[in-house]
């Protein structure tokens, strides 16, 4: 089933990861602890808006930090400056500032627990080896972006740049984020869209596809990180590529223009291509 997600490691590891790498100037743990407690008390899920985190699967528990620093400069013209020599450094972790954002990259020398990466790899219908690669990974790199930057798209861009640079690591075999495991060359290639001033929509959002008795269905996964609702198209009479491209165009429009789709309105990308918008509980990704 396409929507069989299990993103527990992403949620459970993120807070621990941040606590270990926090920088007081950019991240106030006391303030965020209150948010977590309030959400728990209300019995609601924590708001994921602006929380960019993911994992680079590795076939061996090693990474080349110096290479990563070189790749960030070569690929994105971002100079990585670690904290000064008076502060303790960790060969397995790297924390640096980019404007008002904090980038954190850290090696974990063990697989993601409970077969979670393998389960989510099943959602990648575009990569035949996704499940096997996920099953065989032996370690992972945790990647996160946080800080005071208010423009969520800027945080998302930096996250994609970090993960794309990690794709060049010798032992990188997959990128686990947005509820799926991406092929590294796919992820890095689509991140290059940013060099043309385009949004890296295929790095941010997973466009799931599956068939039912009524036809082809498609859905987004990852819009919530940008403070937007997920979208789906149900029972479509369309080719998979057409449906995926439609959803990608729609997601790009919503994110780039900061649009909120309203129930009862119509949307389309040409005069003879109009679709009714219906707000309802999700079918592909039920609450």
Q: Residues of each region from the PLM?
A:
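A C-terminal-region feature
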Residues: 1-50
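Short, hydrophobic/proline-enriched secondary-structure or compact coil segments at domain edges
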Residues: 2, 51-59, 137-147, 287
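N-terminal alpha-helical "arm" segments
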Residues: 38-72
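N-terminal low-complexity, intrinsically disordered segments
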Residues: 59-131
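Short acidic, S/G/P-rich loop/turn micro-motifs used as interaction or catalytic elements
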Residues: 62-64, 147-151, 239-240
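Structural alpha-beta junctions
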Residues: 74-82, 162-176, 252-262
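Internal, hydrophobic cores of structured domains that mediate oligomerization or house catalytic pockets
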Residues: 103, 107-206
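Aromatic/basic-lined ligand-recognition segments
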Residues: 180-287
């Amino acid at each position: 089933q396409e929507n069989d997600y299990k993103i527990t490691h992403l949620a459970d590891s993120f807070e621990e990861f941040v606590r270990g790498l926090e920088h007081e100037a950019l991240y106030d743990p006391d303030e965020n602890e209150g948010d977590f407690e309030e959400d728990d008390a209300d019995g609601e899920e924590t708001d994921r808006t602006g929380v960019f985190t993911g994992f680079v699967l590795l076939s061996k528990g090693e990474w080349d930090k110096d290479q990563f620093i070189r790749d960030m400069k070569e690929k994105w013209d971002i100079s990585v400056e670690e904290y000064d020599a008076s502060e303790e450094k960790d060969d397995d972790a790297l924390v640096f500032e980019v404007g008002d954002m904090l980038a954190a990259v850290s090696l974990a020398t063990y697989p993601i627990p409970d077969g979670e990466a393998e389960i989510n790899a099943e959602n990648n219908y575009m990569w035949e080896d996704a499940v096997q690669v996920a099953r065989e990974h032996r370690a992972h790199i945790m990647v996160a972006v946080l800080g005071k930057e208010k423009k969520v798209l800027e945080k998302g861009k930096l996250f994609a740049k970090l993960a794309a640079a990690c794709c060049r690591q010798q032992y990188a075999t997959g990128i686990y984020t947005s509820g799926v495991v991406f092929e590294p060359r796919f992820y890095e290639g689509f991140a290059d869209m940013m060099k043309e001033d385009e949004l890296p929509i295929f790095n941010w959002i997973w466009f799931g596809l599956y068939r039912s008795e009524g036809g082809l269905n498609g859905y987004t996964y990852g819009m919530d990180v940008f403070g937007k609702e997920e979208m789906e198209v149900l029972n479509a009479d369309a080719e998979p590529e057409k449906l995926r491209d439609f959803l990608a165009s729609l997601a790009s429009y919503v994110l780039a223009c900061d649009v909120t789709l309203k129930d009862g309105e119509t949307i389309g990308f040409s005069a003879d291509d109009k679709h009714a918008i219906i707000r309802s509980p999700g079918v592909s990704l039920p609450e």
